C-alpha cells in the first residue's frame, strides 16, 4: 500500500508558522534593541524603524524553518491510500473507499492561478483537480503544479481547461461547463490537496485501473 499525505499545509500549521514568525520578530527586535543600547545608546527615532524592519526580514528564515519542521511533525490527518484495485481517502474520523474494479465516474480539470498577491502558490501556476464518484461516494483531489509540471501532466492526461468568465478565448477542451464548475465548488469545499509528485502517483494508479483514463478528462 502507498500512502500519500494530504493537506500538508493545513490551517493549523499555517497559523503555527505565522505565530513562529511573530515570535521571531519580537525576539530579534528585543535582542537588537539590547545590542543597540550597549553599542550606540537608547533606541530612538529612526532607530526604532530600522530595528523593526530588520526584525521582520530576519524572522522570515526562522518561520520557514519552523514550517519545514511542522510539515514533518504535524500531519493534517488526511491521506490517500493506494492499493491494488482500491483508492481510500482517510479522514480524521472515517475513511472513504472506492473499488476501482467497479464503475467509477471521474472528471479532471485545471485552471491557472491568477491575480494572487503573495501566498504559497505563485501566479502562473496551475491547479489540477480530479473528482471521483462511485454511487454515493465522492472524492475530490488536487495539486498545484508549476508551468513545467503542468505541461508534462497534460502531455499524458487531458484535463478540461476551466476558464474565467471574462476569458473570451476559445479552447478545444475547455470553457465553463456547468458540471466542471460544480466539481470545482466541491473541490473548494472539501477537496484534499496533494503534493505535485504524489498527484502524479495518483494519476498513474488510476490510469492502471480505470479504462480510457489516459484518453479522456471524464467518463
Task: Give the residues covered by each predicted segment.
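Terminal and domain-flanking low-complexity segments
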Residues: 1, 131-219
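N-terminal membrane-targeting/pre-transmembrane regions
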Residues: 1-46, 188-195, 199, 205-208, ...
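Generic detection of short hydrophobic beta-strand segments and adjacent strand-loop junctions
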Residues: 2-7, 96-98, 139-141
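Canonical hydrophobic alpha-helical transmembrane segment
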Residues: 23-27, 46-64
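Glycine-rich, flexible loop segments associated with nucleotide phosphate handling
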Residues: 50, 76, 117-130, 172-173, ...
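Conserved beta-hairpin
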Residues: 61-105
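Hydrophobic beta-strand residues in large extracellular and virion-surface proteins
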Residues: 80-82, 87-89, 128-132, 141, ...
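Acidic, Ser/Thr-rich low-complexity segments on the non-lumenal side of membrane proteins
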Residues: 86-130
Amino acid at each position: 500500500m502507498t500512502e500519500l499525505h494530504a493537506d500538508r499545509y493545513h490551517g493549523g500549521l499555517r497559523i503555527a508558522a505565522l505565530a513562529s514568525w511573530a515570535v521571531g520578530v519580537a525576539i530579534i527586535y528585543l535582542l537588537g534593541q539590547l545590542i543597540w543600547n550597549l553599542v550606540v545608546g537608547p533606541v530612538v527615532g529612526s532607530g526604532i524603524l530600522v530595528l523593526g524592519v530588520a526584525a521582520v526580514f530576519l524572522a522570515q528564515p526562522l518561520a520557514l524553518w519552523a514550517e519545514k519542521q511542522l510539515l514533518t511533525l504535524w500531519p493534517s490527518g488526511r491521506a490517500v491510500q493506494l492499493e491494488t484495485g482500491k483508492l481510500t481517502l482517510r479522514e480524521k474520523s472515517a475513511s472513504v473507499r472506492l473499488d476501482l474494479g467497479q464503475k467509477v465516474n471521474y472528471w479532471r480539470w485545471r485552471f491557472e492561478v491568477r491575480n494572487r498577491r503573495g501566498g504559497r502558490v505563485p501566479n502562473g501556476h496551475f491547479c489540477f483537480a480530479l473528482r471521483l464518484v462511485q454511487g454515493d461516494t465522492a472524492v475530490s483531489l488536487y495539486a498545484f503544479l508549476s508551468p513545467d509540471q503542468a505541461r508534462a501532466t497534460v502531455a499524458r492526461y487531458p484535463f478540461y481547461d476551466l476558464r474565467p468568465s471574462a476569458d473570451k478565448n476559445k479552447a478545444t477542451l475547455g470553457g465553463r461547463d456547468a458540471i466542471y464548475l460544480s466539481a470545482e465548488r466541491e473541490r473548494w469545499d472539501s477537496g484534499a490537496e496533494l503534493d505535485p509528485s504524489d498527484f502524479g502517483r495518483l494519476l498513474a494508479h488510476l490510469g492502471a485501473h480505470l479504462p480510457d483514463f489516459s484518453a479522456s478528462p471524464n467518463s
